[in-house]
Amino acid sequence: MLAYISGVGGNARQVFYRSPNLTMLKVCFPNGRRTPPHDHGTWATILLLSGEEKNTLYRRENGRLRRVGEVTLTRGEILPMPTETVHVAECLGGKPTIGLHVYGGDIMGEVPRHMWDPQTLAEHALDWNTYETFAQAASQAPSAP
């Protein structure tokens, strides 16, 4: 049986597999949705199944985030992210994106994760209620921070 989780802002995650060492999700972002900067607390790999997704990549330096690049994925493309990666994911192209996300741990449970306020770039421990507030603010901004 697959668990299906829907977010307030329209994100949807379908759990394919979850264990202490590995999580596999199908993730759907609605058109125009942008996440706040966040990490996964472990390595992550995204395989884009449909749509177009821009990922803005950051590195932590001296307690701050520094933008280090952008990668735009289209159907069939893969983005591997090492544990230290911080990124913003953004749905482009006028239709939802759907991706297979694979993580090296239980990111829905025990793995400590972080997020950043998209307006101030202040770091916070990830909690889903605040994450949704940050995602709404990020989606209304003209671009990723």
Task: Enumerate the predicted regions with their spans.
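Short loop/turn motifs at secondary-structure junctions and domain boundaries
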Residues: 17-19, 36-38, 62-63
